[in-house]
Curated annotation (Swiss-Prot):
Chain positions recorded as ADP binding sites: 153-160
Protein name: Putative phosphoenolpyruvate synthase regulatory protein
Any one Gene Ontology molecular-function term assigned to this protein's record: phosphotransferase activity, phosphate group as acceptor
EC number: 2.7.11.33, 2.7.4.28
Top-level enzyme category: transferase
General function of this protein: Bifunctional serine/threonine kinase and phosphorylase involved in the regulation of the phosphoenolpyruvate synthase (PEPS) by catalyzing its phosphorylation/dephosphorylation.
NCBIfam families: PRK05339.1
Catalytic activity as recorded in UniProt: [pyruvate, water dikinase] + ADP = [pyruvate, water dikinase]-phosphate + AMP + H(+); [pyruvate, water dikinase]-phosphate + phosphate + H(+) = [pyruvate, water dikinase] + diphosphate
Keyword field: Kinase, Nucleotide-binding, Serine/threonine-protein kinase, Transferase
PANTHER family assigned to the protein according to its UniProt record, in alphabetical order: PYRUVATE, PHOSPHATE DIKINASE REGULATORY PROTEIN 1, CHLOROPLASTIC
Domain of life: Bacteria
Family label: Belongs to the pyruvate, phosphate/water dikinase regulatory protein family. PSRP subfamily.
């Protein structure tokens, strides 16, 4: 398939348009060129966006795909009227039916979804991020009891990015702790974790993938060798089984999939779905 451009247009950051659009595009086997156009909050900026869209249409000989979460109806009308792209108005698809169902009108407020700077949710997320950073890779045992979840696994199995995603996306205090050769020799969890067994969730990974990741960091080392990775994974999984720890393989899963699975398993009481 020849080159095709996808635009994500918003009068805010464009993150919602891009996230939703990418979820839809993932259903199709092609790799478009992505262009995010955030803060399109005036008619002048709308016309600038239109020029970019129409230029792509002319160069590529195909209509660009345009995902939009524009709230301002005047700006949206300008885009609809003058752009030569296939327009997918994601808010428009849902707002009108919801207005009808709820019997109330949308306030069409720009940035309402992301305007969290004054909210408790925002404060909770900042606190959770700071907590997760302070408890990354077992660097602090202080207040482990305050963790919503404690991730364990061998080095480079995905603990840190998952912890930070849980903190940033859900406001969860996620600690993570490495399982190291000394733990395998003792055949026991690190002593600091034992009192918090119910909060522990394990991450494992295919040895081949682990070796590949470690070689990017420390090539040709014992640490990154396939034999060592196989040994560590075998011991870590055996420990998780002995200790009755819930666990999953991160080998083929995205951070979002890993986090969603963890949430389904731990179901923190304070988290509303």
């Amino acid at each position: 398939m020849s080159q095709r451009t996808v635009f994500f247009i918003s009068d805010g950051t464009g993150i919602t348009a891009e996230t939703f659009g990418n979820a839809i595009l993932a259903q199709f086997e092609f790799k478009p060129r992505h262009v995010r156009l955030p803060f399109i909050d005036s008619v002048d900026k709308a016309h600038q966006a239109i020029r970019q869209i129409n230029h792509a249409a002319e160069v590529e000989g195909k209509r660009p795909i345009v995902f939009t979460t524009l709230v301002n109806m005047e700006i949206l009308a300008v885009i609809k009227t003058h752009c030569n792209g296939m327009l997918l108005d994601m808010f428009g698809m849902f707002v009108a039916p919801l207005e009808s169902e709820l019997g109330i009108k949308s306030n069409h407020r720009v940035g309402r979804f992301s305007d969290a700077s004054k909210s408790k949710e925002y404060d909770d997320r900042i606190e959770a991020i700071n907590f997760s950073l302070a408890h990354d890779d077992g660097q602090s045992n202080k207040d482990l009891a305050g963790s919503d979840v404690i991730l364990v696994g061998v080095s480079r199995s995905g603990k840190t990015p998952t912890s930070l995603y849980l903190a940033m996306q859900y406001g969860l205090k996620a600690s993570n702790y490495p399982l190291i050769p000394e733990d395998f020799e003792r055949r026991q969890l690190p002593p600091a974790l034992v009192p918090h067994r119910k909060k522990i969730f394990g991450l494992t990974i295919a040895p081949e993938r682990l070796s590949q990741i470690r070689n990017e960091r420390r090539p040709h080392s014992t640490y990154a060798s396939l034999a060592n990775c196989r040994h560590e994974i075998h011991e870590a999984e055996a420990m998780m089984r002995r200790e009755g720890i819930r666990w999953l393989s991160t080998t083929t899963k995205s951070i979002e999939e890993i986090s969603t699975t963890i949430l389904q398993e731990i179901r923190p009481e304070r988290l509303e779905y």
